[in-house]
Amino acid sequence: MLMNRLKLLTASAGIFVFAIIFGWIIFPQILKFMISKQVTLKPGTDIRALWAATPFPLHFYVYVFNVTNPEEVAMGGKPRVQEIGPYVFDEWKDKYDLVDDVVEDTISYNMRNTFIFNEKASSPLTGEEIITMPHPLLQPAGINVQRERAAMMELVAKALAIVFPDANAFLSAKFMDFFFRGISVNCSSEEFAAKALCTVFYTGEVKQAKQVNGTHFLFSFLGQANHTDAGRFTVFRGVKNNKKLGQIVKFANEPEMDVWPGDECNQFIGTDSTIFAPGMKREQGLWAFTPDICRSLGAVYQRKSSYHGMPSLRYTLDLGDVSADEKLHCFCKDPEDLSTCPPKGTMDLSPCVGGPLMASMPHFYKGDPKLIQDVDGLHPNEKDHAVYIDFELMSGTPFQAAKRLQFNMDVEPVEGIEQMKHLRKLIMPLFWIEEGVHLNKTYTNLVKYTLFLGLKINSALRWTLITLSLVGMMSAGYLFYQKSDALDITLPPKIIKDTNKVANQPRPEKQEQQPTSPVAVPIPGVNLSNPKVEQRARY
């Protein structure tokens, strides 16, 4: 009986320890190891194929700010805008000219984005709506010359009048013309001023312009980015070190940028946003480099979330306050002079794109309140305008995400150009975009049945074993308690036999009790049939 209790206690304790060690230590490590071997950019793997050509489109939304009082604004009035959108596009991503470097464990490739207008999702918008915006060529040209080449203002003003006859500070055109088909630029004039101005188009300095023939160009915000090379990347494949998977080594064949007045701001941090390493820590954040703004941005953990019943973590980001963060001072025009820093929640893109453009969150969400006060019609809120990513750390899978960014013009009055001399100094919103993804069941099921099913089985197994082991240990403890608490009295066989004999004898007649005589009490181990012993026992 004692041996059985010890066996039960030992077995239960062993199961308990096994459940703890295997369930919380061994199994997760095995799972992480298996994932790390599968999630690499090694040729021939499923992950490599999905990464090289995304088999589903991302959603790409464009919201444009239509200026409803352009004449008033041109004379110094406060802008009033009306948001129109979303114009919905299917964005397909693919990579080409892939070259592996086995020694360095890197892969080089060119990124390409293709936008296809989704008429059904955009309805009732068609793309043919007339939009009024700050003139995308006249205003930037005038502001740039005033800031950097004021001595050339007279020449540039004459050139603008030739190339853009009858142009105003604001331009009304169809949405598709602004963003994809293009605004016509006529460089056919033989005037010296016009030829000097058109040089920037012929040399390719205006990246958004496409040459149609020998004298004409088409300018659009996104046309040149559609189905064209978005830059050459070199990233780690993650075969030798899975923690480095996707991290950018070079962009445009350079190990760092030469855009900002500070090494820290010129670094490539993170991935190209199409892949992340598995098994990251929550506090690491999700970092990605965005060529459009020449900057790496990091999303930070916000809260726990879920997607189709699967647990995930919600990450978010904003542009921060450049003047308040010493690490971001290199995004100021002069890092030593904080007055040259952009307002809170914005980023000066002029060193990156060469024009007076500013980036921000949509509707200046989390920006300086003055930005919102300067323009009527803005209504920032977290639901519609915050950046978010629902991310699963163990597999490195983004379940859903919305990357949102607004582009603005840094407007100021230009004395040398009649159409712009009365403008207010403010940051004028132009449009904002959202690039997002929501994984469908085909791909969420891959995660669910390869990762979460294993985790659920492990959880069920370890808790079952822990429960059984606790029941076993409690049962063993109860049995030990009963053994120690019980009074186990056993008489020798001879005494039991003699006692039975006495019990079977006829009862003697009642005699008068002698008060002074002690009562005869049977004493264990004493032979009561012996008169001498009985006599000693009485006295």
UniProtKB/Swiss-Prot annotation:
The chain crosses the membrane at residues 8-28, 460-480. Residues 1-7, 481-539 are cytoplasmic. One of its GO terms (cellular component) is plasma membrane. Disulfide bonds join C265-C330, C294-C352, C332-C341. GO terms for molecular function: scavenger receptor activity. It is a multi-pass membrane protein. Residues 29-459 are extracellular. Residues 500-539 are annotated as: Disordered. GO terms for biological process: cell surface receptor signaling pathway; cellular response to pheromone; detection of chemical stimulus involved in sensory perception of smell; lipid homeostasis; pupariation. Its main location: membrane. Keywords: Cell membrane, Disulfide bond, Glycoprotein, Membrane, Olfaction, Receptor, Sensory transduction, Transmembrane, Transmembrane helix. It comes from the Eukaryota. Glycans are attached at N66, N186, N213, N226, N440. InterPro entries: CD36_fam. It is found in: Cell membrane. Signal peptide: none annotated. Belongs to the CD36 family. Plays an olfactory role that is not restricted to pheromone sensitivity. This is Sensory neuron membrane protein 1.
